[in-house]
Regions:
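Conserved alpha/beta-hydrolase
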Residues: 25-50
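Flexible "cap/lid" loop of the alpha/beta hydrolase fold
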Residues: 98-134, 171-181
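Alpha/beta-hydrolase
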Residues: 134-188
């Protein structure tokens, strides 16, 4: 029997964004799931209209613990696939022994790996802005096109935005600067 595969989304998305991958892997004989982070489950449009008041307090460690709990309920360790900060979650979970294997796609950097590229800083500062407190951050279609879907046409990017984008906690990326996002590269 093929191992279970868990797909882990990145910021501003939820598990629905992995649906085409889940369908493709299921057709190949894998059991799959794409659970959402805390406060991310549901219809993206509704989540943009009705933001959970606790979203702003969500941290990288809390999301990691959420997935550890889900994985502990499985009969065996899964294969993990994650994108962006979901890829960093995969590395952390593999590091901590919660996966048989992991694939990180365009991973966010772990603690201690920092880029000072002007593009990186421009794309990421709004998400970690220390002056914004713990208020959730809302992606605009313009910003989404610049920071996430810049290889798509603007109309195609806007379609992706409408289908998948949700509000986010600034504390998830902020907290990756601390020990919760430290990776022992010898272990992964």
């Amino acid at each position: 029997m093929a191992p279970h595969v868990i797909f882990i989304h990145g910021m501003y998305l939820n598990g629905q964004s992995w649906q085409p991958w889940v369908e493709r892997f299921a057709a190949a004989g894998f059991s799959c799931s794409a659970p959402s982070w805390p406060f991310h489950n549901g219809d993206p449009h509704k989540l943009r209209l009705e933001v959970n008041p606790d979203l702003g307090d969500l941290t990288f460690a809390a999301v990691t613990d959420h997935f550890k709990t889900l994985i502990d309920d499985l009969p065996e360790r899964p294969i993990l696939v994650g994108h962006s900060i979901g890829g960093l979650l995969v590395q952390r979970l593999v590091n901590d022994g919660f996966a048989r294997a992991g694939v990180s796609i365009s991973s966010a950097p772990p603690q201690g790996v920092v880029s000072f590229s002007p593009h990186f800083l421009r794309a990421n500062f709004p998400h970690i802005n220390p002056l914004a407190g713990n208020k959730p951050v809302y992606m605009t279609p313009e910003r989404f096109h610049y920071a996430f879907c810049n290889t798509l046409t603007r109309p195609a990017s806007d379609e992706v935005f409408e289908r998948f984008v949700v509000p986010e906690s600034r504390n998830v990326p902020r907290s990756t600067f601390g020990g919760s996002a430290r990776i022992d590269f010898a272990a992964v």
